[in-house]
Amino acid sequence: MQSSRSVSTEAFVRLVVDIGNTTTTLAVFTGETEPSVESVQSTLFGEPKAVAELFLSLAHRHGTPQAVAVCSVVPAAAASCSAQLESLFSVPVVTIAASLRLPFQLDYATPHTFGADRIALCAWSRHLFGDCPVIAVDIGTAITFDVLDAEGNYRGGLIMPGIDMMAGALNSRTAQLPLVDIDKPESLLGRSTIECIRNGIFWGAVRQIAGLIDAIGAELPGESKAAPAEVLVTGGNSRIIAPEIASITHLDELAVLRGIDLLLRLNS
């Protein structure tokens, strides 16, 4: 459901929780200031006592949250997290989903399967760039592309393995290839097996992402050489990948969190 409703900017404490496959990020927003952010391993949500202590510690340091939102790609963790937050702070929890009031028009064959993190990123992209076409890329456990046209209509997306998933697959599905941490190589070609894996995954991801951005832009309605699409990139591995791609116009590692907060304010 697309909305033109204005967003409240009152200076109340808002807690947003982004539960990912690997890492969970928590952010406390107050007014329009930059959020206070911290991250924990998502496995923590299997320990209710530890989760309660984490939330109470945040409240002690930043004030009791008056509005809360949970965005999760792990359904079981989302349910337990929301229940704990409601119990601890006696506030309703907004769960990010396609059924919320959205600042863009989501045309998707299976909206119930559209990732909550992708919804938040699209929402922030539309809010940030207004009437410009946007290509939003999240370089995390998976690499996702989501595309909005100049009218705020969702045009489609892409999902591919993230760089750590690629490294894990090479290790787990072969007999001799080691598990390699991926960072920026010093050269294109590797001169050891570890270097070859690292270089292949890193530069392969760079070329894939750059090529797909160009291909999407070429067929995106409303884009021209005079007014190209904005390209917003976020995600845990965005900082090492983004500098290698000239077509990326904006890098914001907090973009999903900002989108969750935006949706919280739109739906509170």
Curated annotation (Swiss-Prot):
- Supply one GO CC term from the record: cytoplasm
Superkingdom of the source?
Bacteria
Q: Entry's InterPro entries?
A: ATPase_NBD, Type_III_PanK
Location in or out of the cell: Cytoplasm
Where along this sequence does the record place binding of ATP? D18, I19, G20, N21, T22, T23, T24, T25, T141
Please name the catalytic residues of this protein.
D117 (proton acceptor)
UniProt keyword list: ATP-binding, Coenzyme A biosynthesis, Cytoplasm, Kinase, Metal-binding, Nucleotide-binding, Potassium, Transferase
EC numbers listed for it are 2.7.1.33
SUPFAM superfamilies given in the database record: Actin-like ATPase domain
Sorted alphabetically, the Gene Ontology BP terms of this entry are: coenzyme A biosynthetic process
Q: Please list the residues that bind substrate.
A: Y108, G115, A116, D117, R118, T193
Q: What class of enzyme is it?
A: transferase
Could you tell me which Pfam families the record lists for this protein?
Pan_kinase
Q: Which PANTHER family match?
A: TYPE III PANTOTHENATE KINASE
Family of the protein in this entry = Belongs to the type III pantothenate kinase family.
**Mind telling me what this protein is named?**
Type III pantothenate kinase
Q: Which gene encodes it?
A: coaX
